[in-house]
Amino acid sequence: MAHPHLLAERISRLSSALEKGLYERSHAIRLCLLAALSGESVFLLGPPGIAKSLIARRLKFAFQRARAFEYLMTRFSTPEEVFGPLSIQALKDEGRYERLTTGYLPEAEIVFLDEIWKAGPAILNTLLTAINERHFRNGAFEEKIPMRLLVAASNELPEADSSLEALYDRMLIRLWLDKVQDKANFRSMLVNQQDESDNPVPASLQVSDEEYQQWQKDIGAISLPDPIFELIFTLRQQLDNLPNAPYVSDRRWKKAIRLLQASAFFSGRDAVAPIDLILLKDCLWYDAQSLNLMQQQLEILMTGHAWQQQAMLTRLGGIVQRRLQLQQQQSDKTAFTVIKEGGMFSRRPHYTLPPEASASTLTLLLQKPLKLHDMEVIHITFDRSALELWLTKGGEIRGKLNGIGFAQTLNMEVDNAQHLVVRDISLQGTRLALPGAAEDSMPAEIKQQLETLENDWRQQHTRFSEQQHCLFIHSDWLGRIEASLQDVGEQIRQAQQC
């Protein structure tokens, strides 16, 4: 078996070759290739003339030896046109019911069925067995069919509660395509002279039958780690609790997990990673409403939980709360405390300064800076005698803001804990403390917790960086996930700097 990274590079080059001359169809080609390499089915929804059939034809060139079959369904289509005509000779000579399948669906590796919902019950029933079991009943015999990829297409969805739902449920990947939108791409498409029937894939990139069979075994060996299962189960629970969520059968979940294993395998990994889960948005929707819903739910999962973003923010919130508690405790210890001396007949308590405040002028620090008289203030200088008079009799108190200029009127009070509190115009308050009493450094407990959290964040970011190289995921998703992780990292850094 090729080295995992060499295999991933080969599949990437194979996809690039298949995409040549197809504009704004890279994602569709890549998912169809993933489906072909893992033996799954694809449904393409979109208006006529947007290269749905060409996508299917291209996939034939991914393999060294692959036969293709395509058919446009109508209400009058018969099983003979899809599965092959009856052998008149076998019926006449031996009385045996047998179809001549050469050149028809039972002998094709790549199958494209356009306007699939117009097929009649006889075709649909046989097709269900072919998709489910990869077998075709030809007369008295069960024949194994080599189909690796079924691409079904239509410009409409099947009607709800119709007989078509069983077939629709078998189509694991569902892609909603539209016309070419970008101006430059539209021009390139108009002037492109490439023959659509040409093989754009070098022989060295094409997949042999032996490789394909071996890869099916290797895909099954890709592990599903417990944290990834928890994410999947969380998504399943979220969908079950939403009133308008699509019904997702257990069969579809199981097939979707195999697709995630294939994504991991062809990305050079030995286990499913969170990045692979984005593929579920193309597997679990049913109609336009559920398509948007799946997009929203996957975004919540990817930007909030897949790399522990929300869990880290919750931890950060707890650390910040603990820090505030410690700061409050420290504030209580370091705040400037006056002595209460209420007289026997005094209705108003009065206070005196503590012995350590013996200087003629006192400079007290604000435990938290405030804006006073249009100035950012970090300390206030008081005349000791004026402060003593205010503590005894009340009235107006003045102090020099940051120790400069004239003394300014202050909104100051003594709180219940006998601490001096100064307030700004919005009544935001902070306690005052003697210089040297305030502890500005971050508590060791908080510093350690923030360092641990930052290390955990770095590990998650490294995991994302290592796993983000996935051919089958659109780059827009990578940008949103990176932004969510950077936001968490920035909040941690801000907390460390406070």
Curated annotation (Swiss-Prot):
InterPro entries to which the protein is assigned, alphabetical: AAA+_ATPase, ATPase_RavA, ATPase_RavA_C, MoxR, P-loop_NTPase, RavA-like_AAA_lid, RavA_ATPases, RavA_LARA_dom
Primary enzyme class: hydrolase
Cellular location(s): Cytoplasm
Superkingdom to which the source organism belongs: Bacteria
Family: Belongs to the RavA family.
PANTHER family linked to this entry: ATPASE RAVA
Database matches in HAMAP family: ATPase_RavA
Subunit organization: Homohexamer. Interacts with ViaA.
Official protein name in the record: Regulatory ATPase RavA
